[in-house]
C-alpha cells in the first residue's frame, strides 16, 4: 500500500502509559520477560519516515521533532509495540467447519481422517483454488488481525506438498506484502506432512522437497525460513535434520513444529540445529526445556490450538522459570485452530498457562519478533525501530488480561501510518 513521507510522520501525544519492551533480542526467563519498561504519562512517541525517532516523556520532545507530523492524541490511553504473530498458516483453501462439529461430537482424529477430513482436506482445496481465491481469504484474515493490533505476521505454506501449490501459496504471501499494510514473514513448510503421492515413504518425500521444491523456492526468493512438522508418525529426527540442513545451506532460517503430540525430542533437536523457534511444545520434556533455556531458540507456544482441541496447555510457567524465551502465536489454520484472536491468546496465557500479563506482552512483542529473526527492527518502541504501535482504549496494559476476551485496540499504527481506528 503506497505511503507518502507525510503519512509516515506521526506524533502520538498525551500517552497515559507507554510500554516500550525495549531490547533487540529475545528475553529469557522470569525476570527479563517480566520487564516491559513502562513510562507513565504524559508520554509521547514521534515517528518520522516510518521509523521511531523518539519515545519517552512528552516534556522532552523538541518542537522541531514534530514538524510536519500528523498528531494523534492518546489521552487516557496505553500505547504498546505492535503485536507479532509469529506462527500462522495464513494461506489455505476451503474450511473444515464440519470437521469441527465431528470433533465436538467426540470423533477421534483418525476417524475424521477416514471421513476425508484433516490436513488432506485442506491440501485438496488449496491445490484446487486459484491464487486470487487464496489471496482473498488470506487478506480477510489479515484485516481482522490488524484490528487486534497485529502489525507483523509469519505465514507458512504447507497445504500443497507439491511444487506447484507450495509456490502458489508463497506467491500469495509475496503479493499480499505489497497489497496491504502488515509486514509478512514467509515460511516454506512443504514438510507439513507426507504428500499422498509419497504415502508411506516420508524419506523419499523429504528428498523430493530438498531436490525439487526447496531450490525453486529459493531461486524465486519466496521464503525467508523453512519449517517442518517433527513428530512421531510424521517426520523423524533424521528426516528433519536432512530438510533443515538443506534449507540452511540454501540460505534460509529454520523452525520446527516440535513435541506437540508426544515427547519426541523435538525441542532438543531444534536447539541443536539453531532453529529460530520450536513451536507447539505441548509435550516438551524436561530435557527439552533445559535445551531451549540454554539456547537462542525461542519457544513459541500456541494456546488457542490447545483450547480448540481441548488439550493440555504447554507448560509456559515451567519453561519461563527454567530460563526459556517464550513467544505466543495464534496458529491460525482451518483445522485445529481457526482463530487468530489476540484477546483469546492473552486470556489463555494468563488464566490457564500461568503467565503474567507482562510476560504475555513480551511474548507477543519482542519475543515474537525474535522468533522470526526481526527483533532488531520490530517488537519494541525505541528510536531506530519501525513505527509499529498499538493504542489501547484504556490507560493501562493490565486491561489486556483484566478485560478479557474483548478487543481493546483503539488504533493500530504500522510504520507511522494509522491503519486501523475503532469507530
Curated annotation (Swiss-Prot):
Residue positions binding Zn(2+): 87, 89, 257, 331
KW Metal-binding (keyword) present: yes
UniProt keywords, alphabetically: Cytoplasm, Histidine metabolism, Hydrolase, Iron, Metal-binding, Zinc
UniProt-listed SUPFAM superfamilies: Composite domain of metallo-dependent hydrolases (SSF51338), Metallo-dependent hydrolases (SSF51556)
GO CC annotation, single: cytoplasm
Note on cofactor: Binds 1 zinc or iron ion per subunit.
Annotated metabolic or biological route of this protein: Amino-acid degradation; L-histidine degradation into L-glutamate; N-formimidoyl-L-glutamate from L-histidine: step 3/3
Binding residue positions for 4-imidazolone-5-propanoate: 96, 159, 192, 260, 336
CDD domains linked: Imidazolone-5PH
Cross-referenced Pfam families: Amidohydro_1
GO molecular function annotation: imidazolonepropionase activity; iron ion binding; zinc ion binding
Localization, UniProt: Cytoplasm
Enzyme Commission identifier(s): 3.5.2.7
Cofactor entry: Zn(2+); Fe(3+)
Chain residues that bind N-formimidoyl-L-glutamate: 159, 333, 335
Reaction(s) the record says it catalyses: 4-imidazolone-5-propanoate + H2O = N-formimidoyl-L-glutamate
GO biological process: L-histidine catabolic process to glutamate and formamide; L-histidine catabolic process to glutamate and formate
Keyword Iron: yes
Main localisation: cytoplasm
Chain positions recorded as Fe(3+) binding sites: 87, 89, 257, 331
InterPro entries: Amidohydro-rel (IPR006680), HutI (IPR005920), Metal-dep_hydrolase_composite (IPR011059), Metal_Hydrolase (IPR032466)
Family: Belongs to the metallo-dependent hydrolases superfamily. HutI family.
Task of the protein: Catalyzes the hydrolytic cleavage of the carbon-nitrogen bond in imidazolone-5-propanoate to yield N-formimidoyl-L-glutamate. It is the third step in the universal histidine degradation pathway.
Descriptive protein name: Imidazolonepropionase
Organism ancestry: Bacteria, Pseudomonadati, Bacteroidota, Bacteroidia, Bacteroidales
